[in-house]
């Protein structure tokens, strides 16, 4: 999951279809505007391999401390899934020098905010924003769980968090509207043995089978300074901050950087149709999905623009046709879910009572055929750019939290190795044209290489029965 596209929404990873906000862009930002978006920073590496990114922002007397471990569900082995997400929970349970379950409460008592962790297919992150005079405490807490978590990890803690994760899956997938259906579609997009096949929570069978030694081995392999990046943004003195970083992180042992898995891209060679009997939601859902280019690769920005043109706002094509004009749908949505290895473009339509998903599919295909022939208008592209840029600007007002400056620096550093990549990112959207949208829809959103999910409750295709008139 690309965190840069989570400027207004945290990654929702439980069913493999995160609700990722699109990276904001402006229609035609002036050069001065682009320079204003650049984030001044310094990047360096400790002798043990820990990357450090520092950026000064003195608007408020606060500091964001953000740690990314470059490991997610993508890096897990068959039979050992869900470990990265499991550690998202375990990392708050205490370490050698920090008592059990006090990490968050300690920071809150000191005025900390935005305290959380998230897991995606591509990375795991932990973040907090603290008063600038509490920076040292935040660094101590982060360094202690990086270097000494296993000293306090017990089978009892593992079993407790294992049950928490099971309940999270039940709530997020098994009893959620369309949860099981969406999972089936995701698994059809990424068949085994692709590491994107499951959801980030992992297989409950794998979690049940995991031993304490299994879990500790995963931590030793991936949660080392050499596979981590520490970003600090806010009201800091750079030299004093460097000294604190060295004090708390510099003595952690160095280990070789783990090798990344080599996975061939998935290619769909025929349409896959899934018909699921929906037992939770009361209205039918049509979801059509395609495999697309990785985050920041050619085609990723075009997909963002098309998603906005199709289903964002009352003027969008699918909303206008299906909700307003033909009154066949309750809601429509579209997204480019950008990820490190391979992305997914999704169209989702919830039917009105009595309308079938087959009817919706015909209408969706008619709209796509129109785009394949004509592209979209320059005005639609401009609206998309403006929407993205507004969100980018909003995100960069904060130093911490999901989509704040620290997270933006981390995301670009993770995916392209350049923390301040804002100008280059913006430039991708400047290159989108009606012709490029038309070509993308023709070449990538093919009817012959997609997953079509029909999730419908029993008898949902029947026209609603009107109450009998009383005599």
What are these regions (language model features)?
Residues 1-8:
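Bacterial N-terminal signal peptides that target proteins for export
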Residues 8-9, 19:
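Cleavable N-terminal signal peptides
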Residues 23-27, 150, 192, 224-225, ...:
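An aromatic/glycine/proline-enriched structural segment found at the starts
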Residues 53-55, 60-78, 82-86, 100-148, ...:
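M16 family metallopeptidases and their MPP-like homologs
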Residues 81-93, 308:
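Active-site recognition of the HExxH zinc-binding catalytic motif
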Residues 93-97, 147-156, 172, 376-377:
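Short, polar/flexible loop-turn hinges at active-site or ligand-entry regions and domain interfaces
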């Amino acid at each position: 999951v690309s965190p840069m596209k989570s400027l207004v929404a945290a990654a929702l990873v439980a069913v493999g279809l995160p609700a990722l906000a699109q990276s904001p862009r402006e229609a035609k930002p002036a050069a001065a505007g682009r320079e204003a978006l650049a984030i001044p920073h310094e990047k360096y590496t400790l002798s043990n391999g820990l990357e450090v990114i520092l950026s000064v922002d003195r608007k408020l007397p606060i500091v964001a401390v953000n740690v990314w471990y470059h490991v997610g569900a993508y890096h897990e082995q068959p039979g050992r899934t869900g470990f990265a997400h499991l550690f998202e929970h375990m990392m708050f349970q205490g370490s050698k020098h920090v008592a059990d379950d006090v990490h968050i409460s300690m920071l809150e008592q000191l005025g900390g905010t935005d305290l959380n962790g998230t897991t995606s297919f591509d990375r795991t992150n932990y973040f907090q924003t603290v008063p600038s005079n509490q920076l040292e405490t935040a660094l101590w807490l982060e360094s202690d769980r990086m270097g000494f978590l296993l000293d306090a990890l017990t089978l009892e803690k593992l079993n407790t968090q294992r049950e928490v994760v099971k309940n999270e899956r039940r709530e997020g997938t098994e009893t959620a509207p369309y949860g099981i259906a969406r999972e089936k579609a995701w698994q059809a997009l990424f068949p085994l043995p692709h590491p994107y096949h499951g959801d980030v929570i992992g297989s409950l069978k794998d979690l049940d089978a995991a031993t304490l030694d299994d879990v500790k081995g995963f931590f030793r392999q991936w949660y080392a300074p050499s596979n981590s990046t520490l970003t600090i943004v806010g009201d800091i003195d750079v030299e004093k901050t460097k000294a604190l970083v060295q004090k708390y992180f510099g003595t952690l042992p160095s280990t070789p950087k783990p090798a990344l898995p080599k996975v061939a891209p998935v290619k769909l060679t025929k349409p896959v149709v899934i018909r699921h009997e929906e037992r939770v939601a009361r209205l039918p859902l049509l979801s059509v999905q395609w495999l697309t280019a990785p985050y920041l690769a050619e085609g990723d920005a075009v997909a963002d623009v098309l998603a906005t043109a199709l289903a964002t706002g009352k003027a969008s094509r699918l909303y206008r046709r299906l909700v307003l004009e033909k009154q066949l749908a309750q809601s429509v949505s579209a997204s480019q879910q950008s990820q490190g290895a391979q992305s997914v473009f999704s169209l989702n339509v919830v039917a009105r009572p009595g309308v079938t998903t087959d009817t919706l599919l015909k209408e969706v295909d008619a709209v796509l055929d129109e785009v394949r022939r004509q592209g979209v208008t320059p005005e639609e592209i401009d609206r998309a750019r403006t929407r993205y840029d507004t969100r980018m600007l909003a995100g960069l007002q904060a130093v911490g939290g999901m989509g704040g400056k620290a997270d933006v620096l981390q995301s670009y550093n993770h995916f392209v190795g350049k923390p301040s990549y804002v100008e280059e990112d913006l430039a991708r959207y400047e290159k989108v044209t009606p012709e490029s949208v038309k070509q993308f829809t023709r070449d990538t959103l093919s009817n012959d290489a997609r997953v079509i999910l029909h999730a419908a409750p029993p008898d949902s295709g029947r026209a609603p029965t009107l109450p009998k008139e009383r005599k």
